Regions:
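Extended acidic/polar, glycine-enriched regions
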Residues: 95-162
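Fold-level signature of zinc-dependent metallopeptidase catalytic domains
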Residues: 140-201, 211-221
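Short pre-active-site segment immediately N-terminal to the catalytic Zn-binding motif
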Residues: 182-183, 278-302
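Catalytic Zn2+-binding segment of zinc metalloproteases
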Residues: 303-315
Length: 315
């Protein structure tokens, strides 16, 4: 280990919890091919997960990434997940057009040089390596500037230290600065809805719920099929992949920058709209509209996709 790396790690240890490292990258391709390109390495706040639960044993997700010590090959962290690209490449557009999607991997900052391996599930169920990257925790190119000052984090419900709890982050999109009171009320209402439903009701004390204020210039989000276009703070939009009720955030970097102000493992984006809609992608995020009569059902339903990789009942 270099002297610089040793100094960095000693300073981190003296400061307390291990920081979170985020790898931002671009996933490009079509139905026939794909490629990965590094965008940035970003240092976030303290890692919210428990150090004894760093390895994902669920075997869920279309993709999996592993962090291994570069010298010994020891597995330090792993996580299965799904992605927007993984859904898009099954569409008819992907048969004729190539597109690019911004994605991120988050994990505790390694104590020494490490290798990150991203794999995709093959037809036989096994994982095959698609991309790898070597990282150095002392790399001066790592962005240590911190979260944007405009993102304000507040506590909806705290039942313990982040490392000992499941940390859920709620982010509102399409709420103006004058609608922050509504956003706070919506976040609290949805939290109560989640914990009124089993099995979350029985495990309420195992969760922390955080929220972040990200004001938009206009109220509401884009609904292209209705002729409504908004440049909301997170750029959430209905009509994802041509499905009118499917709500996604395609600007991953904007979303991750806002979320970086909070400790989180799971995230649900609440859009300030009355139209039925939502979505849930395993270990990425979930979305829901705030003011539809089906919002309570959709909120819990989409969180199930995101949190546990649950399939739809009709599949």
């Amino acid at each position: 280990m270099s002297l610089l790396a040793l100094v960095v790690l000693q300073a981190a240890a003296a400061a307390g919890p291990v920081p979170t490292l985020r790898i931002d990258y671009v996933h490009t391709g079509s139905a026939e091919h794909e490629a990965y390109s590094l965008d940035a390495l970003v240092l976030e706040g303290p890692w919210p997960g428990h150090p004894d639960r760093a390895i994902d044993g669920s075997n869920l997700g279309r993709y999996r990434f592993e962090v291994k010590d570069a010298a010994s090959g020891k597995l330090l962290y792993s996580r299965g997940f799904a992605s927007v690209f993984g859904e898009w490449e099954t569409t008819s557009e992907a048969k004729t057009t190539a597109r690019a999607f911004h994605e991120s991997l988050r994990f505790p900052l390694p104590g020494a040089k490490a290798k990150v391996v991203l794999s995709e599930r093959a037809a036989d169920g096994s994982f095959r390596e698609s991309w790898s990257l070597e990282i150095d925790p002392a790399d001066p190119a790592i962005d240590r500037s911190g979260p944007p000052a405009s993102a304000k984090v507040w506590t909806v419900e705290r039942n313990g230290e982040p490392r000992d709890k499941v940390d859920l982050l709620l982010i509102g999109d399409g709420y103006t600065a004058g609608e922050m009171a509504k956003w706070h009320a919506d976040a609290k209402r949805l939290t109560e809805i989640l914990f009124a439903s089993s099995p979350f009701k029985e495990r309420r004390k195992d969760f922390n719920v955080w929220a972040v204020d990200v004001p938009s210039d206009e109220s509401g989000v884009a609904r292209p099929s209705d002729g409504v276009f908004r440049k909301s703070a997170l750029r959430a939009t209905y009509d994802a992949f041509g499905s009118e009720r499917y709500v996604l955030v395609f600007d991953n970097k904007r979303l991750r920058e806002a979320a970086s102000a909070a400790p989180y493992e799971f995230m649900e984006v609440v859009v300030n709209d009355r139209k039925y809609g939502g979505g849930g992608i395993h270990n990425l995020y979930a979305t829901v509209s705030a003011d539809n009569r089906f919002t309570p059902y959709v909120f819990v339903h989409e969180f199930g996709h995101h949190f546990a990789g649950l399939a739809d009942e009709y599949y």
